[in-house]
């Protein structure tokens, strides 16, 4: 008792064969998803970077400065989520080296000051670029931020 009972292909008369399964460190930890590719280990900023190398023509045409994109200009960018189609609006970040798997939407994206900057929402299938929606920061009439950091998670349109 205590060992898992596994069915074998050559079992006769519906006999069950007991087999011991040993823990394999490489198989277990080697298949675990990671949050980011560790391409910049040891560098001051080891996480994903904004996608400023616009090798993708789609991003090159519609991107703003420093990896910021306007989702409203992506006229053909319809995203599928659990069978429902939707389109993002507003500004966001195009991130490279995210290496996030399906189900990562809603993950927080932090800036170099370890403050929340955006929420991860989607990825392109072709070039491993991820998109994150920027969190709005309230500003005064002169365009100056009222507070250093502010998080407004309510979206309206």
UniProtKB/Swiss-Prot annotation:
Taxonomic superkingdom: Bacteria
Molecular function GO labels: ATP binding; RNA binding; RNA helicase activity
TM helices/strands, residue ranges: none
Pfam families attached to this UniProt entry: Peptidase_S7
InterPro entries: Flavi_NS3_S7, Peptidase_S1_PA, Uncharacterised_MG067
Family that this chain belongs to: Belongs to the MG067/MG068/MG395 family.
UniProt-recorded name of the protein: Uncharacterized protein MPN_589
Protein species of origin: Mycoplasma pneumoniae (strain ATCC 29342 / M129 / Subtype 1)
């Amino acid at each position: 008792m205590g060992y898992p009972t596994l069915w074998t292909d050559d079992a006769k008369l519906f006999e069950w064969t007991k087999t011991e399964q040993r823990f394999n460190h490489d198989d277990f930890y080697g298949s675990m998803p990671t949050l980011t590719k560790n391409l910049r280990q040891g560098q001051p900023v080891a996480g994903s970077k904004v996608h400023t190398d616009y090798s993708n023509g789609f991003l090159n045409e519609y991107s703003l400065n420093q990896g910021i994109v306007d989702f409203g200009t992506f006229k053909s960018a319809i995203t599928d989520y659990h069978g429902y189609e939707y389109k993002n609006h507003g500004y966001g970040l195009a991130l490279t080296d995210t290496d996030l798997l399906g189900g990562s939407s809603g993950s927080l994206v932090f800036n170099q000051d370890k403050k929340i900057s955006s929420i991860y929402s989607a990825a392109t299938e072709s070039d491993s670029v991820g998109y994150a929606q920027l969190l709005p920061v309230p500003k005064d009439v002169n365009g100056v931020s009222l507070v250093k950091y502010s998080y407004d998670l309510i979206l309206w349109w």
